[in-house]
Amino acid sequence: MELLFLGTGAGVPAKERNVSSIALQLLEERGATWLFDCGEATQHQILHTSIRPRRIENIFITHLHGDHIFGLPGLLGSRSFQGGDTPLTIYGPKGIQAFIEISLSVSYTRLKYDLQVVEIEEGTIFEDERFLVIAKQLDHGIPSYGFRVVEKDLPGTLLVDKLKVLGIRPGPIYQQIKLGKTVQLDNGTVIDGRDFVGPPQKGRIVTILGDTRYCEASVELAKEADVLVHEATFAAEDSALAHDYFHSTAVQAAEVAKLAGVKRLILTHISSRYQGVLSEELLEQARKLFPNTELASDFSSFIIPRKK
C-alpha cells in the first residue's frame, strides 16, 4: 500500500505544484490503483510515474471545484484510447454524473470500458471482502467529502507445526482451517480451525480529506488512522483567510491529527503563496503540535507498512 501524490497545489496549477490528485497504490492487495480527485493535467502527471491508467479501478472525488475534477474527461478518454477495457467506478458528490456525461458527450468521447458513476451521500460507499470506504461531509461551502479507507483484518498465520503434530498434511483442508471453519478429519475427529490460526493481522486505515475548515467530521474520519492526508492551504498567520475561504491552516490539520490519534499526518493542497522556504514553514508549524508530520510535494511517495 502506497500513497503517490500527483498534485499537491491549491486552486490553480503552479510551477512547483499541480492541482489535486492522489493515487492510492494497492498493487499487492488487489492489483489496482485508486485515485482521489483528478485535477487538471492529472493524466500528464501520471506519465511521470509507474501508474498504468488501465489499472485504475476506482476514482473518489471529494468535491466539484475545478481543481479537483477538470482532469477527469481527459483521463477517462485516454484510458480507453490506450486499451483500457476493465470497469471503472467514479464516486463523487451530486453533480459528478452530469459533469462526466456532458464532457464526454460534447467531445464525442466513446469509452471502450464500462463506466459507473455513483453520486454519494454520507456512510459506507464501497465495500468488498478486502476494503471498506466511508464518506462524511466536511465544511467547505459546497458539498465536500472526506474518505476513510479501511483495510479489513487479514486471517492470522496458519499454525502448520501444530497441524502436523495431529498428522494433518498439507492440502485443501488447510484453506478451510485457515478460514477458521470446523473441519472433520478422515478419522472422524472434529477440530475447530480457530485453534490452529494465529491472531488476525490488523488492517490499515488511510483517511483522505477534501477541502475543509476544521470540523468534527474530519476528526471522526481520521480516528486512529495509520495515515491522515489533510489540506494545509494556509499558514497559521493567515487563519482568517482560511476561515473566509473554507480552508484549513497547517496547524489546524495538526490539531485534527492529534485529536484523532493518527500515526502520521501528510499535508497537501498548499497555496502557491507558500513556495520554497515558506512551504517548509507550514511543515514546522504543524510539527510543533504533531511531530510526525510530512509535507507532500508532487510525486512524493509514502509507503504504508502493515501493522506488526
UniProtKB/Swiss-Prot annotation:
What is the protein name for this chain?
Ribonuclease Z
Q: Which GO terms describe its molecular function?
A: 3'-tRNA processing endoribonuclease activity; zinc ion binding
Q: Does the keyword Magnesium apply?
A: no
Provide the catalytic activity annotation. Answer: Endonucleolytic cleavage of RNA, removing extra 3' nucleotides from tRNA precursor, generating 3' termini of tRNAs. A 3'-hydroxy group is left at the tRNA terminus and a 5'-phosphoryl group is left at the trailer molecule
Q: What positions does the entry give for Zn(2+) 1 binding? A: 63, 65, 140, 211
Organism field: Geobacillus sp. (strain WCH70)
User: What is the recorded function of this protein according to its Swiss-Prot or TrEMBL entry?
Assistant: Zinc phosphodiesterase, which displays some tRNA 3'-processing endonuclease activity. Probably involved in tRNA maturation, by removing a 3'-trailer from precursor tRNA.
Q: What is the lineage of its organism?
A: Bacteria, Bacillati, Bacillota, Bacilli, Bacillales
Positions of Zn(2+) 2 binding = 67-68, 211, 269
